[in-house]
Amino acid sequence: LVSVLNAHIENEFRTKEFLKDTISDISHQLKTPLAALNIYNGILQSETENLPDLKEFTILSEQELDRIEVLVQNLLKITRLDAGSIIIEKKIENVSDMMHDIEQHFAYRAKQEQKELILSGDDDITLFCDREWMIEAVSNLVKNAFDHTDAGKHICVEWKQMSDMLQIVVEDNGCGIHSEDIYHIFKRFYRSRFSKDTQGIGLGLPLSKAIVELHGGNMKVESVLGKGSAFMINILGSTKL
């Protein structure tokens, strides 16, 4: 019985390793043609300035190329997380600075979609973390909020220190999450049959959760259908200057 169990475990391990390697190889192979397609599409856009119908098609193709590029990048990140090849380089970082970097990243989208991104938190709170990966985790939550929030609505990013723990909350007053989905949203590639978002690929939230857990934290979600959602990141290692 023990030998059978060991064989089963070994076989499962090999299968997972094969899938990781395959995903990583495919993702790397896609990067070069994607870069070329983006260049070609840029040339087409410049050549169709006086052809509005064709110009619109090049803009749409650019959006789809961007979507594929995000998928490839997220697949690579997930694969690296699974393989344990990511080295978290923690330093003391100012939380407000990180959140303002995120605000700048989404400023154009907020203006284009007529949505408001609001920041709320003390300027002197710090966190022992990997700056790049923590920004990635919060940015994915903010992107998710934008994807599920209509024009005229708002997304709020709030951070606060509670004892030696930092809590970051990304809250929106968008469509909310259906009760059937609430326990599945952190599963990879999960797509809700109730969601109006047809562009999402189902990797952003699982990636954020994995990054937070690598930092020794946890992530929770609260949502009311039709009223909005709040994603909460809780991490130890916070101090106030």
How should each PLM-predicted stretch be described?
Residues Q63-L71:
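Short alpha-helical segment of the dimerization/phosphotransfer core of two-component systems
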Residues E89-I92, K111, E116-T126:
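Conserved catalytic submotifs in the C-terminal HATPase_c
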Residues A145-F146:
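Short helix-loop "hinge" at the ATP-lid/N-box region of the Bergerat-fold HATPase_c
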Residues G152-D164:
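Short beta-strand/loop element within the Bergerat-fold HATPase_c
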Residues D172:
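Acidic ATP/Mg2+-coordinating residue in the GHKL
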Residues I177-Y190:
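Short conserved segment of the HATPase_c
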